[in-house]
């Protein structure tokens, strides 16, 4: 994925965040798909770890179930954060905002393929609001 440089929004905009902070948050959101896969694999790993722990152990003490449960909590927390912030940005446009920020989709794609029910200006207002809310919650 190439980084598309867009014109910076004015510092007077109510949802202004620094350009570098925006890119940090954008790349944070693009990991959503990986987190979903890792979260799902933790379920299988916990079941596997529970079976392994019943076997005679080696000299290395560890709690595999706790390890996978902590990973699951880590990924689950991030998944819920992005979903909650997308819902806060606009509960009606939530599914479109979520897909856009986690898959890097443009408004043009959302309009032509997914028939987003709003105009470009409204969408980008909610898109900026999403990143502003995410920035506030991650401080």
Q: Where in this protein do the model-derived segments appear?
A:
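N-terminal interaction/assembly modules
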Residues: 1-88, 108
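Conserved aromatic-histidine-acidic binding/catalytic patches
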Residues: 20, 70, 115-122
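Long, hydrophobic, amphipathic alpha-helical segments used as structural scaffolds
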Residues: 40-43, 90-93, 134, 138
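Short acidic alpha-helix initiation/capping motifs at coil-to-helix transition points
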Residues: 73-76, 101-103, 123
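Amphipathic alpha-helical interface surfaces
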Residues: 78-82, 93, 126
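Short amphipathic alpha helix immediately N-terminal
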Residues: 88-105
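Helix-turn-helix DNA-binding module
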Residues: 103-120
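DNA major-groove recognition helices of helix-turn-helix
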Residues: 123-137
């Amino acid at each position: 994925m190439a980084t598309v440089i867009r014109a910076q929004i004015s510092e007077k905009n109510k949802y202004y965040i620094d350009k570098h902070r925006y890119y940090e948050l954008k790349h944070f959101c693009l990991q959503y798909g990986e987190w979903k896969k890792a979260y799902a694999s933790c379920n299988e790993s916990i079941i596997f770890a529970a079976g392994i722990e019943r076997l005679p152990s080696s000299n290395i003490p560890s709690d595999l179930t706790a390890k996978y449960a902590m990973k699951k909590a880590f990924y689950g927390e991030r998944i819920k954060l992005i979903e909650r912030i997308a819902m806060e940005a606009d509960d009606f446009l939530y599914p479109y905002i979520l897909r856009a920020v986690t898959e890097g989709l443009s408004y043009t794609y959302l309009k032509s393929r997914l028939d987003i029910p709003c105009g470009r200006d409204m969408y980008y207002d909610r898109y900026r609001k999403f990143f502003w809310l995410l920035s506030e919650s991650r401080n």
